[in-house]
Amino acid sequence: MIYHSTRNEQLTASSTHAVLQGIAPDGGLYICDPAALHFDWRAALEKDTLSMAADILHALLPDFENMEQLVRDSYAGKFPTSDLTPLTPVADKYVLELYHGPTSAFKDVALSVLPRLIVAAAKAEGMKGDVVILTATSGDTGKAAMEGFHDVPGTRITVFYPYGGVSAVQQAQMATQEGNNVRVCAVRGNFDDAQTGVKNIFAACKDRDLHGAMLSSANSINIGRLAPQVVYYFRAYGDLVKAGRIRMGDVVDYTVPTGNFGDILAGYFAKEMGLPVGRLICASNANDVLTEFLTTGRYDKRRPFYKTTSPSMDILVSSNLERLLYLVSGDAGYVAQLMAQLNEQGWYQVSGDILARLQAVFGCGCCNDAGAAEVIGRLWREQKYLCDPHTAVAWSVAESHTRGEAPMVVLSTASPYKFPAAVLGALGEKTGSDEFAMMEQLHALTGTDIPANLRGLEGRPVRHRDVIDTGDMLNYVLSDVLK
């Protein structure tokens, strides 16, 4: 399979090169046509989770050898069960729990695999120098990426996060990360500033001598990050068949809390590969740029930025939407035009035809902090089910999109213990300033378990304290790459 840039179909790459490079030379994202794979989804569903994952990844990334072994090595000892992502019935819906990995966030599913994909890609491409991973994070990606890449030979990783824009637990997870090849730095600005800064570094270094090193990304702009996320849509569907809730071929709807659009795009990939996905519901918080876009076709980032209790969705520039625009339009020139207008003017409007194609698959909705808190409290009171604010946003939106003829799967992206203040407040409890004490308080109140990776986090030594302006990000990276 040949990948190409979303902005220029002549800029092609093998799957190994696409994973290694992360982003296309023109700033576009690498894309393939998942509908052209003729993937045997029924056969995949008959397999265990890891073999299913290997089949899906081999279909999407065919230039990698020994994918089954790569997948099994990637997940060995990192998740409590071989199913990775359990599906839990809650009221009239199903919650797909994606947070049982080593950092208690859904990013672990993909970022357990990506380091081995990049190392394998570097070997296949004959690369001799280090692969330098650059990542912007709104909270969860950074820790999951560092956990995946720490002390992996031939790699280095630098993570940027918005100063004051992540939870205390998320910041502590990153600041205490061990590893001789990891750096994390706060950026004065929001996530979009950090993400734009990373993209600008890629552009600035395109023709620069990096002493044999190569830049790549662990964000979902890298197809190697996106591809593993497709797997859990298949896993959830298979679990519903196994439980007798649906028959093979029945449609299933999914509601996804998303900011950068990667997690929900993985669901669209699954649908294009043949999985009977009905509707994909895009759930946003108060930063509702995606809700407006999927309702009107107008994408406008010129709006207030809100810090919410679901910070991983506090995003105004959704990078992976670019891939969807290409898949729906089939026109790289059109996508390039839209992206240029977004960069220069801060907005764009898609045609009525494109909007109709999007709305045939995607629904949308948004939920503010008060709405999310109401859901957290209600689910605990009525179902004794504890969820985090991102999941609560998704649940709230799913309630207005649930159809009787199709089961609704709500993707749960993080442990509630990563956001103890918001969860305790939603349960009507008094909260203080110490999020680690609040984790214990939440445990005592609900009897639910604190994830082992979060317990004792406050006592670990802080290893990373850097804070810089966005304009200093390039020099920060070069000081490491060129040393």
Protein language model regions, located:
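PLP-dependent amino-acid enzyme catalytic core
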Residues: M1-K483
